[in-house]
Amino acid sequence: MQGVSSALLLSAGQLGPGAAWYRQEGSSECSWLRRSQPSELRTNFSSRWPWPRNSESRRSERLQWPGPASAKPEVASCGDSRRDYSSLPARHLSSARESSMPGALGTVNPQPVRTLVPPTLDEPLPDALRPPDDSLLLWRGLTKGPNHMGRLRNAKIHVERAVKQKKIFMIHGRYPVIRCLLRQRGWVEKKMVHPPGTALPAPQKDLDSSMLGDSDATEDEDEEENEMFRESQLLDLDGFLEFDDLDGIHALMSRMVRNETPYLIWTTRRDVLDCRFLSKDQMINHYARAGSFTTKVGLCLNLRNLPWFDEADADSFFPRCYRLGAEDDKKAFIEDFWLTAARNVLKLVVKLEEKSQSISIQAREEEAPEDTQPKKQEKKLVTVSSDFVDEALSACQEHLSSIAHKDIDKDPNSPLYLSPDDWSQFLQRYYQIVHEGAELRYLEVQVQRCEDILQQLQNVVPQLDMEGDRNIWIVKPGAKSRGRGIMCMNRLDEMLKLVDCNPMLMKDGKWIVQKYIERPLLIFGTKFDLRQWFLVTDWNPLTVWFYRDSYIRFSTQPFSLKNLDNSVHLCNNSIQRHLEASCHRHPMLPPDNMWSSQRFQAHLQEVDAPKAWSSVIVPGMKAAVIHALQTSQDNVQCRKASFELYGADFVFGEDFQPWLIEINASPTMAPSTAVTARLCAGVQADTLRVVIDRRLDRSCDTGAFELIYKQPAVEVPQYVGIRLLVEGSTIKKPVPVGHRRTGVRSSLPHLLTQQGSGESKDSGSPTHRSASRKNARAESLEHTEKPEPAAVASVSGKGKKAPFHFPSLHSKAWLPSPRVHRPQGRVLRLQHDQLVGSKALSTTGKALMTLPTAKVLMSFPPHPDLKLAPSMLKPGKVGFELCCTTWRVVLSGGIGEEGHRQRAAPRPSSAPGKGLSSTEPCSKTET
């Protein structure tokens, strides 16, 4: 570790507020020194750490010293109940040694101070701490001595209390601070054990782009707490937990609760457990289906829907982003690249004019000897005429017309002012000017036009200032973190080669291209970004907590747009920690490449921008976080007992405007530097305050977390299991009488109409079944379109005729003979001299022979011209049941066995919701 002095968090359980450990540089031995933190490291609330002050949160019993009484260290004189391990052999990180520390900042401390770094369990215990020979060693630190049964009894009591209070937790990953703070609250850990031969499912990073906004497997794609990619830590806090459990009590209690249900689960990735199998009172630190904003592809897609959720423009805080694997996005990106190049030409003209006016004649004469001959020849080799500026002006003018919706009548597939071939030539000349140093010729008249159009574009293009004039874009994998696979490019053909050369790599939108911020805010000529934490405790209503403390990460190289190497433009600590600082780097920059937000605020005051943090930066970051969550609220699986801590990365423009780059799930909590050692431990402690302490006490201290957004609750109707069921049967096609045969078993009485005849498919006769359906349909259509005058029926009670689009109302039935078929068993027999009907109605457009006492009620609104349905007749039941969903038939009477009319039995009212219509079901009659 470098620097004059560096702060080191010793242990979350051994330090109080405002304490840190320092090491004086240049010392050959380990010389860590404890002193108070500087004022800029403190916050405005009372205690930096949530150490329990009440007896309920403290450890219920005091753990006994495992060794003999003669080797027991004395209690510290500070007045608290913490044990003094000063008699233990000191070591620095992995080596155990003892040394005297000089005073702070060069002063001499007469009293020797030993480091409190405990030995690991792999190291042998000192002779003074070895158990007696007559004792049985159960495991490291726990011996079956005189007080063995008492420790077991106390551990059992503590476990029973934790089980009763539902204070069982389970952790997957390296979270020593969480373990320590939960143990202080009386929680007992249940070890997460995986069966031999099984492993956690690897995160699936290559999925369909359509699923990236909803998938369960991609929400944690930007997690940085992966065991395989763990950052180097300034201090391994797991050693302190092992030393704190030197007597084995916590290991014993973990074994006691191995069959208990954990009520707090803290994991690195969400896919470790399936939330669907958790009970309602089990808390977990992840939400399912959060990939809609924790992946670059999901954030790119969902922020486009922001106008539907809020009156805001995503282009004002999120750089333009496209998916290279999607054809629509690819086409939009190409057009955006063209227009950006045209705007950059206008900027170059204005910049060259300002430069020519600012340079004096004397300065030009002084620079003339420095201009070597090759440079003059290079300028003469390539010269771009003023026509190139006219093309750029015309393209920008057409773009303004398109934004104003003046191109409504234009073909959407037509090119933007220039054809694709012309745009290709335009880009080649643009590359010559920007990248190869060609000379751009322009006219004085063109300068004023460029300024006017740029002023108009300023009002409609929010990213005009930050995009610069070199047209640099950054290509990123859709679901990766820590800067893996990121490339900065400035040529369109090179970016499109990623799609053409490797289609499998770009399939389904796995890669995105985003506009690079060419004019970022710099500190001492170096680029930086900011990591901001926020906590989501509910999605309905959406509840967001914003952390007041943050940290910034510097690059190791000076900023330059001519060098597109990742060491210059990517500030991820996972990349920069492997690089050496440039010799041209400003000496005021920190050696560990990190500042706290308090130090950044002090720098803003030094550069005469004291209000930039409170008036521009913080409000902009809060708004960006809220908008990103609003657009993803419908995609995330809401679970009341879940919560999640996210880390957002921001880059600032020259006007201090924050630009959201990405949002990471499971942000790293590794104490890689002195800044992260303090802040990462603090954000974990304050997270437990919000999700655990606040559930019991709504007015408790939430640390540095601030509630910035909470929606009104939206009630979701509960599913009660109601099934919508529609019952019924199809209406049989009527059977014309002219084609019936004697002895044919039929389920309907044979009818005769004025239009032709045809046998029903249900008549049972193979001969008549072969009748053409096409002819029957043609007859029906002919009957519908051209009804005969004699077949027109008047509307009951009115003098008007029924409209022709009701074909059944224009059909008039004729009796073939004074005979009718009567059912006897399964054979139809003829009955003579009985008149059974005069009119009939059918929904199929053909007449049916019906009884004179039948009525048909329409359950749907009729045609406007037909205000009342006429009286209609229905045949009696002839050995079948007819159930109709379109027409309701109410039968009031029937024919007796001898042909006389009889009264029908009263029909009971049906229960609502069980019939075929909204009022009552179809009735069944008996003949």
Swiss-Prot record:
It comes from the Eukaryota. This is Tubulin monoglycylase TTLL3. Highly expressed in brain and testis. Expressed in heart, kidney, liver, lung, muscle, spleen, trachea and colon. Expressed in sperm flagellum. In the brain, specifically expressed in ependymal cilia. The keyword Nucleotide-binding applies. Its EC number is 6.3.2.-. GO terms for cellular component: axoneme; cilium; microtubule; microtubule cytoskeleton; sperm flagellum. It comes from Mus musculus. InterPro entries: TTL/TTLL_fam, TTLL_monoglycylase. Disruption phenotype: In knockout mice, colon epithelium shows absence of glycylation, a reduced number of primary cilia accompanied by an increased rate of cell division. Knockout mice show no visible motile ependymal cilia phenotype. Simultaneous TTLL3 and TTLL8 knockout mice are subfertile owing to aberrant beat patterns of their sperm flagella, which impeded the straight swimming of sperm cells. Simultaneous TTLL3 and TTLL8 knockout mice show no visible motile ependymal cilia phenotype in brain ventricles. Residues 345-702 form the TTL domain. Residues 35-47, 752-769, 916-927 have a biased composition (Polar residues). The gene is Ttll3. SUPFAM superfamilies: Glutathione synthetase ATP-binding domain-like.
